[in-house]
Regions:
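Amphipathic alpha-helical linker/stalk segments
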Residues: 81-108, 153-159
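C-terminal peripheral helix-coil segments that are non-catalytic and often amphipathic
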Residues: 1-19, 112-115, 119, 147, ...
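Hydrophobic/aromatic residues within well-ordered alpha-helical segments
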Residues: 31, 74, 81, 85, ...
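Amphipathic alpha-helical segments used for helix-helix packing
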Residues: 118-140, 188-196
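Short, leucine-enriched amphipathic alpha-helices that occur as contiguous helical runs
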Residues: 28, 32-40
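Hydrophobic alpha-helical connector segments
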Residues: 94-123, 163, 171-178
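Helix-turn-helix
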Residues: 34, 42-76, 80
């Protein structure tokens, strides 16, 4: 029987089983991660201006159109990579609280930061490159969330000092010093290896470096 004039046929959306949906979500996440990893590798070597969307898509083994489905532009991809990096870096600092032992807390933080320099040197170099260039794409993140966090954790350090648990020191300069020293082992790894013939990937050198930084700080 033919359908009457004007009758419409509604096509229902395809429904996936929970297992299939979970598998699809995992595949999408893996592809997004692969794109971000490829972008990190290229951005940390060539910068934003020296990297093309085509290069990232080729390294990630996805089509350009597929990449632009996840990230609307090269700048958007870059910002996603570097803000994710900033989130990872700041997570250990967020755990600081006045109830903790300051020496133990700072020693653990130094270790985590040095491990990040050892395990993720490309991330450190990318962040360094961005800041040296004036942080044109990251300045809002530095002026708001980062500043808010540093103000809060500076207050914790001041509480430690006032309780007599830590020698008087400017909290901001203390945090900056930890960042500068630990990230040096990623950003200047070539110089360190040229002078010492080692880097922090060497377990013994890592432990020696960690011990000395903790003592200095």
């Amino acid at each position: 029987m033919s359908k009457s004039e004007g009758q419409t046929i509604t096509k229902s959306a395809r429904a996936f089983s929970p297992t299939t949906q979970k598998r699809r979500e995992k595949a999408l996440l893996e592809k997004r991660t692969r794109i971000m990893d490829a972008a990190l590798s290229l951005f940390s070597k060539n910068g934003v201006s020296g990297t093309t969307v085509e290069q990232v898509s080729e390294l990630a083994n996805v089509s350009k159109s597929n990449l632009l489905y996840y990230f609307k532009s090269k700048e958007g991809l870059y910002l996603s990579v570097i803000t994710h990096l900033l989130d990872v870096w700041l997570t250990p600092l967020q755990s600081f609280s006045a109830e903790q032992d300051p020496i133990e807390t700072l020693s653990d933080y130094i270790k985590v930061k040095l491990e990040m320099s050892r395990d993720n040197p490309a991330e450190s170099k990318l962040f360094c490159m961005e800041v040296v260039q004036g942080a044109p794409l990251l300045i809002k993140e530095l002026e708001t969330p980062l500043k808010t966090l540093l103000d809060a954790k500076s207050a914790v350090i001041i509480e430690w000092i006032e309780a007599g648990k830590l020698k008087p020191v400017d909290p901001i300069h203390l945090i900056f010093s930890i960042w500068a020293i630990t990230q040096h082992y990623a950003d200047f790894s070539v110089q360190i290896k040229a002078v010492t013939a080692k880097d922090v990937s060497d377990p013994a050198f890592f432990e020696s470096t960690l011990s000395n930084i903790q003592h200095i700080i």
